[in-house]
Amino acid sequence: MLHPARPKEKLPVVYTSRAKCRDCYRCVRVCPVQAIRMKDGQAEVVADLCIACGTCITVCPQHAKAYRTDYGKVLQMLEEGEKPALSLAPSFVVYYSEWEQKRLPSALRMLGFSFISETAIGAWHTSMATLEHIEQSPDQSHICTACPAAVSFVMHKAPALASALVGVVSPMIAHGRLLKTAQPARKVVFAGPCVAKKDEAQWDSNAGIIDAVLTFEELDELFRLKNIHIDQCEESAFNEVVPGVARLFPLEGGLLRTAGLSTDLLHDHIVAVSGYREVKSALDALADDPAQTDRKSVV
């Protein structure tokens, strides 16, 4: 993924609800980039350091850590008569039940989305571009990731390895570009499970591509506010057909599968990792081999 260039006035993605914070320090202990500091007895998120991985949100027993929501922004778009396109992350098949998946396109159209397509279409383009990049530089080590939190982690914790990041945009951005190219004036909204996508959308390099980022929970909140019940919607299809293999992209090693590369654990030159501890371990291994005598692609 392309390196993040954040705007000077970066909107915080993760923040502390001060009234709920109870001095337990759990978020401070688990933050992989030490972006949480104690101030006046409160665990405060340092926006410039935060990679929006969401770990602190998960561990906080008081629910004092939260993420910035964009559903109000999308609701305003819809109420002003906008007919945005929706890029839906392929992991919706995990969040929604099988019968809900069949009715989801109709529910989204009832909300006001004019074009509904899976982000997996962008995943195919990202995978092919990544494969081309690797083939053009076979003698170098590569870090291949579409995860904005992982990219930010490299920039914060292993800046010496930043040059190994494959300069390819994520599926969200690739898909957003395709949708904007088709209709430049149309708003594009992304929906998925990842909080870090809210950060990625505001990087300078991605300006004007994604107009709002929703989590699946925010999507459900829009359905609630508009009194739309998925179980009462008709079955319907998305506006575009997805290359089947591209739906594997969110899985560990999914980029490899989509690009047609080996995911065999015995493959000497490809390491597929997930979770910041595994990512850190893989980065440490690369950093310990500055001459790249053991060239690897970390995915």
Predicted feature locations:
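Iron-sulfur-associated redox domains of electron-transfer enzymes in respiratory
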Residues: 68-299
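A broadly conserved sequence feature marking short terminus-proximal activation segments
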Residues: 1-25, 254-275
